[in-house]
Structure formats: structure tokens, C-alpha cells
Amino acid sequence: MAAAPSHPAGLPCSPGPGSPPPPGGSDLQSLPPLLPQIPAPGSGVSFHIQIGLTREFVLLPAASELAHVKQLACSIVDQKFPECGFYGLYDKILLFKHDPTSANLLQLVRSAADIQEGDLVEVVLSASATFEDFQIRPHALTVHSYRAPAFCDHCGEMLFGLVRQGLKCDGCGLNYHKRCAFSIPNNCSGARKRRLSSTSLASGHSVRLGSSESLPCTAEELSRSTTDLLPRRPPSSSSSSSSSSFYTGRPIELDKMLMSKVKVPHTFLIHSYTRPTVCQACKKLLKGLFRQGLQCKDCKFNCHKRCATRVPNDCLGEALINGDVPMEEAADYSEADKSSLSDELEDSGVIPGSHAENALHASEEEEGEGGKAQSSLGYIPLMRVVQSVRHTTRKSSTTLREGWVVHYSNKDTLRKRHYWRLDCKCITLFQNNTTNRYYKEIPLSEILAVEPAQNFSLVPPGTNPHCFEIITANVTYFVGETPGGAPGGPSGQGTEAARGWETAIRQALMPVILQDAPSAPGHTPHRQASLSISVSNSQIQENVDIATVYQIFPDEVLGSGQFGVVYGGKHRKTGRDVAVKVIDKLRFPTKQESQLRNEVAILQSLRHPGIVNLECMFETPEKVFVVMEKLHGDMLEMILSSEKGRLPERLTKFLITQILVALRHLHFKNIVHCDLKPENVLLASADPFPQVKLCDFGFARIIGEKSFRRSVVGTPAYLAPEVLLNQGYNRSLDMWSVGVIMYVSLSGTFPFNEDEDINDQIQNAAFMYPASPWSHISSGAIDLINNLLQVKMRKRYSVDKSLSHPWLQEYQTWLDLRELEGKMGERYITHESDDARWDQFVSERHGTPAEGDLGGACLPQDHEMQGLAERISIL
């Protein structure tokens, strides 16, 4: 309900026909309220105020201002149309006087003097009123004693106590805890205070509208009735003896800020409630002793499991009490804070729509990775960071084949015997047939070929040859053993057993993502495709099979991670290359799927050349497919493929500037990437100076400018210390990651040793920047890295401050970026205002080469750039 003017007292009211005139205008307030008076001559101007189909006969005192009339109009709206009022109504209305003699019937009232006796004044809503204004209607909360059990309409929990258990809104009648008052959105409907538009404000009788049929109201009545509708304020010390306490909801400015936030699906987890709680979707009690319902991990929304699918995607992120703290209250790091990470997530089941547990430990083992010798300083060489997973798994419900198998590989010629279990996604090598602990997983998506035995060079002397080979990108597995035990026996040997495994694996390598899921005996198999959502044109189609729109290549794996596998594909009609991210609901129940949903919800709200484009999404009962544009490679491949294992400064400036521009767009939308690393910076082409785009928003969070979060996210090697120390973080988290990316791009190593304190390492310049290779890198680059790798968040550079750093404000970089914008046909990195500055820079430096000759200004790096371009084109 709208906050009406705070000074309604003294507002005039309309006289009624036949009422005796008062002795003077000053005595109007002293008369009984039930005896309204007709004003004496000279005491004011009487006229009608019309709002829609409602008219009120009012009196404007002499020497009144236009503000007086607006206050009166707001009071009428608050009483007769409370559901139409909103915060700031006074500043959003215009007054027009009806003038039948003019060609323009409505004349704008600019001052109170424009209103004459008997005029009809129309109240019109200004065009400056926005949709957000209509959504802000503060509650009028008073302490209330309930005679029957009641529940809070904000958190769903029961209002406990014998008397004065909670707060009731006088406008809409909803009930709240006192502790929830600050969190209550200003969305009062005003249903309890609404009056019929045909009812006069001064009378309880219903009357028909007429030119003078409305009974007048005294100023005292109008003041009292209007005050009843205003949001309450806490009583002052002078009124401490009052029997009622008054409360207001959360600040209006907070509501305006929250309306601009991107809304995402709720993160539901199964929850056990210790207090009686109602479902906030259906308003019915959550019954049971434990695991009664679902609770959103971020906003604490409660609902039944059956109601989860009907809950709108309107989560605004973590509530203030659950992690967002004002920036000025955030403390710097102390030794006491450096404790081990605590696991925030429950071990209970998770339902669709929930975010996955974020693994934050280094990989426990990597078969096939050659150990690179570290330098004497103990620097960690740059590599693709692999998130660790617990080496346990549940038995798949779609097991295709299982049994004991003997095997060895080209990396390890020692024969091993494990219990293999093949399902539709991978081959799992278990320690035995009764445990869920496994030795290794071989994803089917990584198997390039299954060939008969042909390479016998690695067969140990005196042993039997293998039966067939499983070839992956890094490892070749030699499976089976020709003579020996019975087929399929516990020894894992035998030609027949090996032949059966070879056939089963070949069948599993077929495009299973396009096949129908195996159905139970007696059940009719159903179609995979059920729903298609097009992001580009917002079209939703049912019963659309993804195979009819896109050709997916299961053997073209573009990447894999915690959130699924990305396959290459092609649009059937246009031949356009695409990337398809797949989540298997059956194998990965809701964890990775929920992160994917969060990524889709965020990408739907983003349209920027520096962010990967989301085309559409398909969902089936078993899988979720997200179709995105296919890019050439990632920034990590570019770094690793360079001749020296690091990038030249010129190219690093070019790439970092693009990353910062994309981050600026994200932060403007209050979105923090939270997992920025070279693997998530994709290259659009094989050019030596390519366009880059940010991807993988599975960890992304919606964080306000002065808000903090505490959820554990991201990849440890690129994470800021506030996350690793389980403290609140904000959008500066991404800026730390940019500093790490700069460091690894210029040096080819990670900046920190995980065994030593980050503070000590940063303060030790000799450790952070050894002579090789940093003696060949400019001091400007080191200065920018130092300002990004600040442990104290308030000292860390922002996006705009980083873009303004002298190291990035370089003429050659500007030329490279302008050339890229010319190829793209869109100017989104540089700005027109920079043109004059750089033109002046060229004119002042007469020795500066022309634009076409600037490529020769960096001769030491040109050889590197040429070699790098050749390697990128091969990737």
C-alpha cells in the first residue's frame, strides 16, 4: 500500500448541501466531526476531485499551495484504492482541470490559483511512474495477539507464544515474526482496507455518484482515516506507553535494488524441520517427523516436494542473514580465520533445481600425466586443473555388463585385475564386486576406438598377449588375455570373455544420448525428447527430438567437468557447428543438473559479444541438453602450445582487456563468475589475436555491489583467499582470478605454492617474481598483478580501475582491439571517446610509426606470435 502524505491533518473536506455555514474558517476543526460545515465566503474554494469513476467534493483553504491538493488526492487513493497506491505516489501524479470552453478539454494545473470554485480536477498518473513503483507497497505492521495457531507468511514457521506472538499487516492481513520484519518485501495488497469506489470517505453509506451527492468529510476524519492506512513507525520515547508497537518492512531502497537482480531457479535441498512449518506454495502444513519438505539453500523458501515444480523461478540469491553482509562490516583476515574449509552442504538427497556440492580438493591421482620437473623455487607448472571426486560410486541402474577383467596400459605395463562394470556412460574399474570403491573410471566419451589386438610391443616377456585394445587420447588400454580360465570366470582371462567385452563396449559407444533409455520389462519405451526451449526467440515446443534438429557427435568431446560432458555437434539445416552440454539425470541425480540450470538461467539474461551465446535447451525425462555456440579452443591451450610455455605481453594485454570488458558487463548485471580460469576463456578462432568469450557459469552467483556470499565455489588454484578461508566474498573474487590468469599467461606457472601462506608469498617479491622470466616482463604488468592479487578485498582493483591501468592503456593494444572490432563489425571493447586521445598521441609523437607499420614495433615478439599462430591453427 502506498505511503500517503505524512501531514494529512488540516486537509479540508467538502461541504454538504443544506449544512449551516460556520462562523469562520478557523472554527472548522472545533466542530463535531458528524456536523460538516459549508465554508463561509472567502474561506476557500470548493471543487471536485475525480479519480477514475470516483468523485470527491472537497474544500481548498485560502492561500493553499498545489502540494496541498496533491496530498489530498493521495489520501483519497490510499483510502479508496489501496491496492493501486505505491511508494512515491505524491511525486508521480499530475492534476488536470476540466475546461469545456477550451479545445483541449484538460488543462494542466500548475498552481493552486488555477483551481476555481466548482471546478472538476482530474488526477492522472504521470508517465514517470515505472513498473517497479507499482510493486513497492509498504506494509502497516502492528503487534498482534493470536487466539489460534498462526504461521509466518515470510518464513513459514509457526508464531509461538501466548500473547503478542507476531505482527499483522493492517493492509493485507498477513502475519509475520518480529524477527522477519526487516526481510518482508514491500508488497502489501491492501485488501483489508479497500473501500468501494462509490462510498464517500465521510460516510459508511453507499451512495451513487453525482455532482453534489457525496457527503463531505471533516479534516479530522480524513486525517484519522488516512493515518490508519500509513505504514507504522516504531513509537518514539514520548509514546512509549502506547499499548501497540508499530513496525515497517525492509527499506524501500533495498526493494528497488532487489528488483534489478536476475532471478534464478531455487536451490532446493531436502530439509528436516524442528518447528511446525507450512508450505509457502500451497500454505499447508509440512507433515512428518523429519525430511518433511524442501528448503531453498539461498533464500530459505520452504515447500512440499510435490509443490517444488510449481514454485516460480524467482530466487534472488542468499538472504542477508545467510551470507550477505554489508561491506563496511567485513573484517580483514586474521590468523584465527585461517581454519580448514567447512562443508556447508548436507549429505541428504537433492532434488531437481538444487546446486551441486563444490569439490575444492586437488586431484588425488592422474594416470598418464608425465611429471614435469619443478624449478628450484618449487613453482607449480601451469596445467589443466582437474577437480577431485570421491572415488566411490553407486551401482548404475543401467549396467550393460560386469565381470573380472585383466588389463594393462601403455603407461603401466604391470597387469592388473579389476571388476569392470560397463554402463551407458563409462567403464568403472572396481576393487572387487562388493564395494563401491573404484580404481578408475574410463568415460565412454573419451574412448576414441576399440581395436583388435595389434600392438604387441609392450607385452611382457613370457606372458600371454592381450585380446583387444581401448584407445583414448592419452592412454591405450590392453584388455584380456588369450589363453587361460573359463570364459567370464573370476580370472578375467579367456578369449570368449574378452570378445564379449569388446562387443559390449562397441555397442555402448553408439550415440546413446540419442537412443531411448532402457525400459523395464513389460513397459513401453518412451521418447527421449519432450521439451525444447529456444533462448534466441523465447519459443517453447513440446515433443521435439534433439536428433531432428542437431547432429551430435559422441566421439567429439570438447570438454568435461563436474557439470557434464560437452560434445561437438552440427545444426542439421544450416550446418552450423555447435557445442552441446549434456547432463544425465539418471547417473548424476540433480547435482550437476542443478548447476546447469543455474548456468542456463544466467546465460538467458546475458547478451554480450564477450560471453558465450546460448542457443537453446532441450530437456527429456533422462537428460538435459544445452546447445551453445562452438568455439575454437580455450586460453589454456594457447598458453600451453606457445613456444616458451607463456604468452607475449602484447597478446596478454589483448586477451586480458577482453576478459575485463566481459566481466564489466557481468558485474553490471550483479553477476559474479566465481570460476574464472583460462579453461573458461574460449577462443573464437585460430587467429593469433582471437576474440575471447567467457563460459561455464555453473558456479556463477548473483551478488550485489555491497554484498558478500559464503558459499564454497570455484577452482582452488584460481580462488581468492577469502573463499579458501570460508569468509564472505563479493565481486572482487573475479578480479583476483584475473590476476592469477595474468600471472600464468606471462610466466607459465601458478603464482603461489599451496604449502606456504599466501600473505608471506605476496610480500616476498623474489619468490613471486624470480628473474626468469620476470626480468623480461615490464614493471607495469607486475604492478597490475600486484594490485589484483591483494589479500584485502577493499584494496583489490575493480574492473574499471584495471582497464584504466597504464599497462593496458597502450597504443598498440588499442590498435589490436580496433582491428578485432573491425572484423566483428561491432564496437564493444573500445569507445569513441578514445579516438581523439590516441590521434593526439600519434600527432605528438612524430616518430610513432603509422598504423600499418606498428606491427614491426615489437620485433622480439613477432617471431613468437608467428609460431603461436601456427600452433593454434593445429589445435
Swiss-Prot record:
Bias (Pro residues) ranges: 14-24
Domain PH: from-to ranges: 398-510
Zinc finger intervals, Phorbol-ester/DAG-type: 138-188, 265-315
Keyword field: Adaptive immunity, Angiogenesis, ATP-binding, Cell adhesion, Cell membrane, Cytoplasm, Golgi apparatus, Immunity, Kinase, Magnesium, Membrane, Metal-binding, Nucleotide-binding, Phosphoprotein, Repeat, Serine/threonine-protein kinase, Transferase, Zinc, Zinc-finger
Catalytic center residues: 675
Pfam families noted in UniProt: C1_1, PH, Pkinase
Biological processes, Gene Ontology terms: adaptive immune response; angiogenesis; cell adhesion; cellular response to vascular endothelial growth factor stimulus; intracellular signal transduction; phospholipase C-activating G protein-coupled receptor signaling pathway; positive regulation of angiogenesis; positive regulation of blood vessel endothelial cell migration
One Gene Ontology CC term in the entry: cytosol
Phosphoserine carried by residues: 26, 30, 197-198, 200, 203, 206, 211-212, 214, 244-245, 519, 707, 711, 873
Activity modulation notes: Activated by DAG and phorbol esters. Phorbol-ester/DAG-type domains bind DAG, mediating translocation to membranes. Autophosphorylation of Ser-711 and phosphorylation of Ser-707 by PKC relieves auto-inhibition by the PH domain. Catalytic activity is further increased by phosphorylation at Tyr-718 in response to oxidative stress.
EC number(s) stated in the UniProt entry for this protein: 2.7.11.13
Modified residue annotations for Phosphotyrosine: 87, 408, 439, 718
Protein task: Serine/threonine-protein kinase that converts transient diacylglycerol (DAG) signals into prolonged physiological effects downstream of PKC, and is involved in the regulation of cell proliferation via MAPK1/3 (ERK1/2) signaling, oxidative stress-induced NF-kappa-B activation, inhibition of HDAC7 transcriptional repression, signaling downstream of T-cell antigen receptor (TCR) and cytokine production, and plays a role in Golgi membrane trafficking, angiogenesis, secretory granule release and cell adhesion.
Protein name: Serine/threonine-protein kinase D2
Organism annotation: Rattus norvegicus (Rat)
Lineage: Eukaryota, Metazoa, Chordata, Craniata, Vertebrata
Gene: Prkd2
